Structure formats: structure tokens, C-alpha cells
Amino acid sequence: MIRRELRASLIAVVVLTAVFGFAYPAVMTGFAEVAFHHQANGSLITKNGKVVGSELAAQSFAKPQYFHERPSATTPPYNPGATTFSNLGPTSDALKKQVQAAIAQILKTEGPYNPGLTVHEIPVDAVTTSGSGIDPDISPAYAALQARRVAAVRHMSLGEVKKLISQNTDGRSLGFFGEPGVNVLELNLALDRHAA
């Protein structure tokens, strides 16, 4: 009797492992490759046939002719292999110092192009990290704050830059989830294409 139960248990383990450990993942992977090829392969963005990044992960743009991303919570910064959130609460002194440093940097970087810029005009996403620590999107408000700098450095009209921001702004998911966002990598690539 014990032998029969042991045999049935072993057969169940082998069958369930084969079905849920091999067959089901293979079918789902195949379906994803066919139906969602771009997403299944990391939502990669290419330039001149070379992969330059992903729609899903931020990367650093420090040069003034590019739009800048929001702060990163990963170590080293913008490391997609170490996505994390800061876990700092609103009463945290460390968070206050990070935000104050980010505000000072924004005022230094954007202030000369936006005379009279005040702390209250700086969007929250310009000085805080995202939940993943490497969010590729910024708010349209943060993009608009940077538009004058990018236009001046690239010798473009402000209208041209704002048009590129608008063209690279994604709406809410399904029309009502989340907030509109601007993918920084895609916007910067659009700027490079415009200059070419």
C-alpha cells in the first residue's frame, strides 16, 4: 500500500514538474515572443542598429544639451541590476538632505535659463527617486522646466523643443491609470535626430 502511494506521489511530481516546470513556461515564452516580441526582449531601443538602452530603465544624461532624468536610488546610479527604492520616510533627515541637494542642483542647472525660478516651481520628480530607483520617465512639467536649457544649448527654438516633448509624452495607461510621462532616452534620441 505504501509502495502504491509512493509510486503515485512520484508520478504526480514528475507529471506536474513536466507540465508546470517545462511545458507551461515554454508555451508562455513562445506566446510572448510571438505576441509581444518587443516587450519580451526588454523593450530595447536602438540607434543606427545598436542597442542604446531600454524603454524601461533610466540612464544618466549629464550633458547640458540633453534632458536629465530623475534622481536614481541605485548604487551605482542608474544600475538596472540593482533596482531599489530608498525606503526613506518624510521625516528622514537623509531624505531631506538628498532633496535639498537635488533642489540646489536644479536651481544651478536650470536657474540661468529660467530667471526667477523658485523652489516651488520645481516638480517633485526632479528631486525625488522613483519606486524602482531607475524610472525612465519624467513628468511633462519637469521636461518643460528643462526645455529652455536644451533649446539654448542646442540653438533650437523653444517651440521646437516643446513640440518634441509633446511628441514623446505618453498618456495615462488605459486613459485613466497613472500620470502622463516623458521617456528621457526617447526624447534625447529625438533631439539627436532633429539635429542631424
Language-model segments: residues:
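Membrane-entry signal-anchor segments at the cytosolic-membrane interface
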Residues: 1-19
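Flexible, solvent-exposed loop/hinge segments and secondary-structure transition points
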Residues: 12, 20-21, 26-146, 153, ...
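Extracytoplasmic/periplasmic C-terminal soluble domains
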Residues: 144-196
